[in-house]
């Protein structure tokens, strides 16, 4: 006689085993209609699963995050159902849930086109409109294997052979004549799966191994209702308009080419943004009392063997050789910083020692993963490492956190999600050391009034870490900042200092990144601002234009005055109509356009116009210079009179 306890504390008593759906129906027909699955004693189960003993139960609907994930997973099965009807010889591989949607990897003879996707989506809707029940069956491993072998599903057979124990009872989900395999849960009926959209295809190797066959990956998105789906599609449309690759080309910021995959060719305007960002970071480094250093971009393989990188990271490292020695091009800066720390005897009085570098790093990312500035092979890290005593960890972490928020606020990022990753099962260091380290990180976040979630077991083997994920104007998440404690690397590389008792001790090392990759952060900013960079970051801050040739000398005088004040100004003296010039520079997202006519020459003033089309009238040139300098120096996100 199971007693079912609901989230509100109420209880329901039954004299026989009941399904999740039975309990939902007992509560009310509305809840039963909305029931996708259940959470029984913390574990997600299908709506059809029986509860045979006392249990805590929560009914899962499409309004719950778990419900939406289940719905998306079932849409992947719906995709499988449709593709097998249209192209029966297709072999199905894997179809997991991803952020905002799902994908399915398929082995199909022809290359899928946009027309194929439209046809596939139409068939999916036709199937979903039948509102058929999804039937779950738990079977023996052998029965599951026989089922898929008989259907020619080689990839499902391989999953069973290589990933599933012979003692397991896999779950088979029946969508009419189509059968798929999954741990579940899944929706009980396809009426939940009406609001989806197939998006694109790409190539994907089976098992992610380039030695295996290339499959075709079909991506889709799915939501609980039409309103959510349309809102997401609108966000995607806006994201496409903001794509940094498109804007980068329009604004002539950078380019990339096949001869240097994943490497950035910065053009003048893009490099101007890079250097301005670098200047800002340098100012903050000085404010927070960091040294700036520069290490070599490649070092002997022997050093990387000592650090453990060669054993655990070799496939991502570029190598070269000279005079019978093998060198690794650095994928990160930390080993070099330890080498600098090791030069000369250090005392506890020298700590904390804060060391920063704009480090040029290279990582051998798979070519298929490269994506504009967001995923590159050559990048610059705004990397820093703090060497300190165990007693100093809390204060130093506190300082790092303040620096993160200080810098992010300058760019207008307000929503920052913070996670604290704690000790994994395999780790070095005593439990006492880990407890203290985790407590120090948590206390620093709490002292700064920062809410955070724990990620149990997600820390590195050498220490816990804090991750800062910023959300942009489209609510996309970008993990940029980290504060990572390291109990391992200093000892591996023989770093030490003389303690108060005149004994040698190993310092704690704090890895600290805020922007992460400079290239990636510029990509994020380009999309956040849609190319409308705040004036302090804009490559060209002001364009001064004449209406006729008679104002040319005055335009040059005004331009020089602006340039002498340190403002990035250009003169446009072309023999073009003023409306054409204004439109062109507006499209180039230049913050300010100054127009000189005869009236301005006579009065010694200048007509000021913003890129958003706001006419600020004719102003004294010195006033314009002062106001622009105030805006630039304050790194304001807003233009004059906004």
Curated annotation (Swiss-Prot):
It comes from the Bacteria. Residues 1-61 form the TGS domain. Gene3D superfamilies: 3.10.20.30, 3.30.54.20, Anticodon-binding domain, Bira Bifunctional Protein, Domain 2, Threonyl-trna Synthetase, Chain A, domain 2. Zn(2+) binds at residues 334, 385, 511. Its EC number is 6.1.1.3. One of its GO terms (cellular component) is cytosol. One of its GO terms (biological process) is threonyl-tRNA aminoacylation. It holds the Pfam family HGTP_anticodon. Belongs to the class-II aminoacyl-tRNA synthetase family. Homodimer. This is Threonine--tRNA ligase. It comes from Yersinia pestis. The gene is thrS.
